[in-house]
Regions:
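Metallo-beta-lactamase
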Residues: 2-10, 14, 21-22, 27, 81-84, 88-129, 136-138, 163, ...
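Short beta->alpha connector loops
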Residues: 27-29, 50-53, 72-75, 125-127, ...
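Active-site environment of divalent metal-dependent phosphoester hydrolases
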Residues: 31, 53-54, 73-78, 97-100, ...
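Structured loop/turn residues at beta-strand edges in well-structured enzyme cores
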Residues: 63, 115, 178
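Active-site metal-binding motif and surrounding structural segment of the metallo-beta-lactamase
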Residues: 50-93
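Pre-active-site segment of Zn-dependent metallo-hydrolases
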Residues: 23-67
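Active-site neighborhood of phospho(di)ester-bond hydrolases with catalytic His/Asp-centered motifs
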Residues: 46-49, 66-73, 91-94, 142-145, ...
């Protein structure tokens, strides 16, 4: 599901006027995706970054990197390497405790906001916590894990797939007042067209689609979760 050897040719995704994304290992089923986002003050934040040769060229034209952020307990990825490269700490929201033990770099804690994004905690399971980030000024939503867009995680015509373990009790409260123009994801290409409708469809039909998800996506999602803790 996830390839652990050194990355080769990365793939650029999710480019818009205030950010860009990349997949360091685009051929893997898990489609781990990283992002560089420009903050309102002009500084650039790297979110859940995964390294690849020359990947700095992807975000070089956005501005100077002022921080590295990790927004999920299983997304330590290459945050420490990027923090050292850009001489910045790794910023982690409160409530994410597992990941700090796996980051070999200075860690700074935040609570409610980061780079103009409001932060909201989502915890589908006791051992699974992540932080959803939404920036109202440009209606950008970032979801690390609980939503994804890859074919391995979606059901039918869904453009956003909700993790099968969250379908019985979907985290609607965390997304209740969010109306995104774009949804960036920690796994898969972002959703840029009719993003709000795609989000509403996924959350509103999560339980109804659970039986299909148990057959079509659950085996792959289980492999992904097992692989993530290695």
């Amino acid at each position: 599901m996830y390839r652990r050897e050194s990355a080769g040719d990365y793939r650029v995704v999710d480019r818009w006027h205030r950010g860009v994304g990349w997949q360091a290992v685009p051929e893997e089923d898990g489609l781990r995706t990283s992002h560089a986002v420009r903050a309102p003050d002009g500084g650039v934040w790297l979110v859940d970054p995964l390294d690849a040769p020359g990947v700095g060229d992807v975000y070089a034209d956005l501005g100077d990197v002022v921080g590295v952020a990790v927004l999920a307990d299983y997304h330590a990825r290459d945050a420490a390497a990027f923090a050292e490269r850009h001489d910045v700490p790794v910023t982690v929201p409160t409530g994410l405790d597992r990941v700090t033990e796996r980051i070999d770099a200075p860690v700074r804690r935040v609570t409610d906001s980061l780079a103009g994004f409001d932060l909201r905690r989502v915890s589908p399971l006791r051992a699974w916590t992540e932080t959803v980030a939404y920036r109202e000024r440009d209606r950008t939503l970032y979801v690390p894990d609980v939503l994804s867009s890859g074919a391995a995680f979606t059901v039918g015509d869904e453009r956003l797939g909700l993790n099968v373990l969250a379908r019985l009790s979907p985290p609607r409260e965390a997304f209740a007042d969010i109306d995104p123009d774009r949804v960036l994801l920690g796994h898969g290409d972002g959703v840029f067209g009719d993003a709000s409708d795609a989000l509403d469809d996924t959350l509103g039909n999560a339980r109804r689609r659970l039986p299909r998800a148990l057959v079509s996506t659950a085996p792959r999602e289980l492999r992904a979760m097992v692989d993530a803790v290695r």
